[in-house]
Structures are given as C-alpha cells and as structure tokens.
Regions:
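Conserved serine/cysteine hydrolase catalytic core
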Residues: 189-236, 248
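Catalytic histidine-centered segment of alpha/beta-hydrolase-like enzymes
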Residues: 252-265
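Alpha/beta-hydrolase fold catalytic core
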Residues: 1-28, 47-51, 76-89, 114, ...
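Active-site loop/oxyanion-hole signature of alpha/beta-hydrolase fold enzymes
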Residues: 40, 44, 53-98, 266
Length: 274
C-alpha cells in the first residue's frame, strides 16, 4: 500500500510498505538496490510475534524517487517523516547494509527509533576498503543489468545462482529462486542506484554517539564472510557506537537474514523484546 508523507525538504514523497502480523511494531529497512522483499526469508517468524512494517526506500522497489537531492541524509529524513506520519516514532528498527547505516543514523538522532539491529552497516571502511566496495559492487551491478534477459534461468539453476551471488551469500542454494529474481530485477531497474551508491562511498564516516547516550538496546551484526565490507569494519562500527553489542554471524556473508535466517530472526526478537 502507498501512503503519503512529507520529507524535510518539504517535497512530497510516497513510501510503499507492507504490514504483516500483529503486536508491537517493528520497522525493516532494506539495503541499496533492494526492496522490502529482501526480508522474505525472516518475515514469517517476525510477523508471528510483531507487527512488521517493511518499507521500500524512496527510489527503490515500488517507492518513487525523492524530488531533489538524493543522499543518505535525505533518505534518513524521509524515513523519519514516514515514522512520524504513521505514529511509529520510537518503534524498533532493523536495517540491512545501507539500511543498517540508516537505522544507525536514526538511533543517533534520538527519539526516532527504539531498539535497533543493524546488519552489516556500510560506511565504516578505511582507505582502499572504500574503493574495493565501490568497484566490486559497481561491476557486479553492471553484470546483473547485462544478464537480465537470462536471469530467470540463472535464478533457477543452482550453479549459476551460486556464481551470481558469490559476493553476497555464503548459502545461495538456500535462497528461493523467486527471491533471487526479484532482487536482481531491483538492482537492475532502481532509478537512483548509481547516485545513491556514489553518495554512499563519498560520504563521511557515519557519525557515532558518546558512551551512555543510548537509552535502548543496539546490536550491530556482522557476517564473518562479508567480502564487500570486511569484518574488521565491525570493530570500527562498535567504536563509533560504544554502547552497542557486536554479534558475529558465522559462515555468513553481508546478508545474515539470507544465510542464517533463524539466527537473525531470533536475534531481532531478543533485542527488541520488551
């Protein structure tokens, strides 16, 4: 469903979202190039306990792009306005990849979200690590765009799927072909992918917060096998958010909710429990 809200730019913005389950609200924020469907691997166990609100960030999925500047800041502003518009300010939040960085920013602002689980947040690179992420991701997306004609076949063939998803999943065989196909279409067609990727890699390191500033639990989760943002970046993330707890996902790439869905769902529910 689409609901109209307002961005701090005073520009009208539409944010597509789905709501599943009942109970205490839980916000899910996907990563760069993706959509709410990225969370399908853990949607069912979360919705059994919580009222899950999974959004498409502006310019991704079924949400139109923002008018004017598109950056990490304006995306954060748009999510903030969405939460206020729907009486969800202070709700618990989970983010993946770029979405993980956004929920860290919302936690830093104070009063926007409650408990937070940030899964492999982007932006804690140093020196050449930034270029590795940018070049690897940029080249991979070009390949995905070029292979769209063959993607239905690639998504259903285990060996081809494993080759395609090597940078992103340690267990591509466990992913549903329908999810893979939807994700690859999203990467190929998102109108603001290139611009947001450039802003992400050019942006200053994420602002942290002083010790003792958090009033709600914050967990930073990281896959030991993340080859886009190396595990040592998790230490920098925790240094920026010293009150956070660091959770390691063994045998996982950059998307723990893909490679370890049961562990990820359990971590989210435990962290955001009353």
């Amino acid at each position: 469903m689409l609901r109209r809200t307002r961005c701090t730019q005073a520009a009208s913005v539409l944010i597509n979202y789905v709501r599943r389950g009942e109970g205490k609200p839980l916000l899910l924020v996907h990563g760069l190039g993706s959509s709410w469907r990225s969370w399908q691997t853990i949607m069912e166990p979360l919705a059994a306990k919580r009222a899950v609100v999974a959004i498409d960030l502006p310019g991704f999925g079924k949400s139109p792009p923002l008018a004017g500047e598109v950056s990490l800041k304006t995306l954060s502003d748009a999510v903030t306005q969405f939460l206020h518009q729907h009486d969800l300010a202070g709700t618990d939040a989970v983010g993946s990849s770029m979405g993980a960085r956004l929920v860290l920013e919302l936690a830093r602002r104070g009063g926007v979200v409650g408990s937070v689980v940030s899964l492999d947040p982007r932006g804690f690179w140093a020196g050449w690590e930034r270029h590795v992420f940018h070049t690897s991701f940029w080249l991979w997306v070009r390949m995905v765009r070029a292979l769209q004609f063959a993607m239905p076949l690639v998504a259903t063939q285990a060996r081809l799927r494993a080759l395609l998803l090597a940078p992103f999943s340690a267990r591509p065989d466990a992913l549903a072909p329908s999810l893979v196909l939807e994700e690859m279409r999203g990467y190929a067609t998102a109108p603001w992918f290139d611009g947001v990727l450039s802003d992400l890699v050019r942006a200053s390191p994420p602002q942290g917060i002083a010790p003792g500033s958090l009033t709600k639990p914050l967990v930073i989760g990281w896959g030991r096998l993340d080859r886009l943002c190396f595990p040592r970046q998790a230490v920098r993330a925790q240094q920026a958010f010293p009150d956070a707890r660091l959770h390691w996902f063994e045998r996982c790439g950059p998307f723990p909710h893909w490679d370890a869905p049961e562990e990820t769902a359990r971590l989210i529910l435990e962290t955001t429990a009353d």
